[in-house]
Regions:
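Hydrophobic residues at beta-strand termini and immediately following loops
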Residues: 28, 89, 134
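Short aromatic/basic micro-patch
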Residues: 27, 63, 125
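Non-catalytic DNA-recognition/assembly elements of restriction-modification systems
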Residues: 1-17, 133-136
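Specificity-determining recognition surfaces
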Residues: 17, 107-136
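Short edge beta-strand segments in beta-sheet-rich domains
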Residues: 23-25, 81-84, 129-131
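A short beta-sheet element
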Residues: 52-53, 58-106, 110, 122
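DNA target-recognition patches
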Residues: 14-48
Length: 136
């Protein structure tokens, strides 16, 4: 069976924006992602988030790269903005089925491999430069 580097399977969308007041309604932070489910059940903020955030589109896979051992993965339920402590991932559909992709990202197979490349002790984080080279 062929193996693929993660960058051959997924696109890491790095488009960012500085939030405006109305973005508080469509903001997702890591605190909104629950381990064990791809569904988002809460979102938003009382005030506009501060600092640049990642732009997400409905259907994107949101992955918590900070403290990845918490296994926070979800499917974006709408267009909006996402925490810069995460990654906005999209499947390369010529390689992986778009419906399977979120299941793969939330699998122990993927998450265990990703956690192993986390750097830092207080708040371990996964860097794209390391993740993109993992083979699956």
């Amino acid at each position: 069976m062929s193996k693929f580097r993660f960058e051959e399977i997924a696109i890491n969308s790095t488009e960012k924006k500085k939030p405006v007041e109305s973005d508080k309604y469509t903001y997702l932070g890591l605190e909104h992602l629950d381990p064990g489910t791809l569904k988002v059940s809460r979102f938003g903020s009382d005030v506009a988030p501060i600092g640049e955030k990642l732009v997400m589109k409905k259907g994107d896979v949101l992955f918590g790269k900070r403290r990845a051992y918490q296994k926070k993965v979800a499917i974006a339920p709408f267009d909006g903005i996402f925490s810069a402590h995460g990654m906005v991932l999209r499947p390369k559909t010529e390689v992986i089925d778009s419906e399977f992709f979120p299941l793969f990202i939330s699998s122990d197979y993927f998450l265990d491999a990703a956690i192993k490349i986390s750097v830092g002790s207080l708040s371990p984080t996964i860097n794209w430069k390391d993740l993109k080279n993992l083979e699956f």
